[in-house]
């Protein structure tokens, strides 16, 4: 490739990067304008945020149905359900590593 083609490629790449930065800036402006429409900070604002993060009742029911179907298939293939004691944990806690004094002065 000639130097002119390389320079043109660099210029084209710079133009694309500018477009992405502008799009990101537009997104940032949209986010800041959304904050203006939100109610004043307080308990109601926090409650609204929590409600948005929770899945809907229909979504929960779909997950329950999918889990029930998967359990039925597992049991129909000969799978068994084992009940374990409540005080049994998968991994014992790790012994804390003391790094005090491990580095030379």
From Swiss-Prot:
InterPro entries: SutA, SutA_RBD. GO terms for biological process: positive regulation of DNA-templated transcription. Keywords: Stress response, Transcription, Transcription regulation. Induction: Up-regulated at post-transcriptional level during survival and slow-growth conditions. The keyword Transcription regulation applies. Residues 59-83, 92-105 have a biased composition (Basic and acidic residues). It comes from the Bacteria. The keyword Repressor does not apply. Residues 1-105 are annotated as: Disordered. Pfam families: SutA-RBD. Transmembrane segments: none annotated. Disruption phenotype: Deletion mutant forms smaller biofilms, and produces more pyocyanine and less phenazine-1-carboxylic acid (PCA) than the wild-type. Affects expression of many genes and impacts fitness in fluctuating conditions. Residues 1-37 have a biased composition (Acidic residues). Interacts with RNA polymerase. Causes widespread changes in gene expression, and plays a direct role in the regulation of genes encoding ribosomal components. Associates with chromosomal DNA through interaction with RNA polymerase. Contributes to biofilm formation and secondary metabolite production. Important during transitions to and from the survival state. This is Transcriptional regulator SutA. The lineage of its organism: Bacteria, Pseudomonadati, Pseudomonadota, Gammaproteobacteria, Pseudomonadales. The gene is sutA.
